[in-house]
Amino acid sequence: MILSDWDIRVYIEKKLLIIDPLFDDTVRENGVDLRFGDEFCRFKRENSVVDTSRDGVDNVLECYRVRGDGFVINPLEHVLTTTLEYVEFPHDLVGLVNLRSTFARFGLYIPPTVIDAGFKGNITIELVGSTVPVKVYPGQRFLHLILARTSSPVYKPYTGKYQGQRGVTPPKLDNSSSKNF
C-alpha cells in the first residue's frame, strides 16, 4: 500500500522514518521530495574498459563539490549524485524513486531505483543527461520518493554494501566473481 501524506507524517513523528534534514515541503500528497546534495561525479572521457568483475571505478570518476554555481549535466552524460537528505527506513517500508516531472521535462532520466526496507544513508542516484546541457543546483527538489508498506516487516532488512553511505557512493564490487558461476 502506498502511504499518504498523513501516514508519512505519522512515521516521521514516531521516528520510524528518518529524513534529515526535513523541510516544510518534503512531505507531499503521496510521497516525499528529496533534494540534490552538493556532490556530483562524472565518468572521465577515456577509452579504457571497466571490468565489472574486478575493477573499481575510482580511476574513471571525477567528483565535484558544487556550490551556488550549479552543475552542468552534458548531453547523454551519465552522472552520479546524492540526496541532501539522510534517510533511515523502517523494516516495513520500501521506497520507489522517481525523478520529479519538472526535471524529466528537461529530458533528464533516472533508471528504476528501489530503496530497501532497513536502508540507512544518503541516496546515490544515477542521472542521465538530456539531448542538451542541463544545469542543476544543490538544494533543488529533484526526486519524488513513493513509500510503500510491506505486508509485514521484512525478515531480513537491508544490510548490504551501501548501508550507511554518505554522499555519492561509487559502485562496489561483490566479493564473488560472475566469471565463476
From Swiss-Prot:
Q: Which residues bind dCTP?
A: 100-105, 116, 158, 165
Q: Where is this region: Disordered?
A: 160-181
What catalytic reaction does the record list? Answer: dCTP + H2O + H(+) = dUTP + NH4(+)
A Gene Ontology biological process term: dUTP biosynthetic process
Q: In which pathway does it act?
A: Pyrimidine metabolism; dUMP biosynthesis; dUMP from dCTP (dUTP route): step 1/2
Question: Which keywords belong to this entry?
Answer: Hydrolase, Nucleotide metabolism, Nucleotide-binding
Q: Name one Pfam family in it.
A: DCD
- Is Hydrolase tagged as a keyword? yes
Active site: which residues? 126
| Any one GO molecular-function label of the UniProt entry | dCTP deaminase activity
Enzyme class per UniProt: hydrolase
Q: So what EC number does this one have?
A: 3.5.4.13
InterPro entries given in the database record: dCTP_deaminase (IPR011962), dUTPase-like_sf (IPR036157), dUTPase_trimeric (IPR033704)
Q: Which PANTHER family match?
A: DCTP DEAMINASE (PTHR42680:SF3)
According to the record's subunit comment, the protein's assembly and interactions are: Homotrimer.
User: Its biological function?
Assistant: Catalyzes the deamination of dCTP to dUTP.
Q: Which family does it belong to?
A: Belongs to the dCTP deaminase family.
Protein name, please? dCTP deaminase
Q: Specify the taxonomic lineage.
A: Archaea, Thermoproteota, Thermoprotei, Desulfurococcales, Desulfurococcaceae
Q: Which gene encodes it?
A: dcd
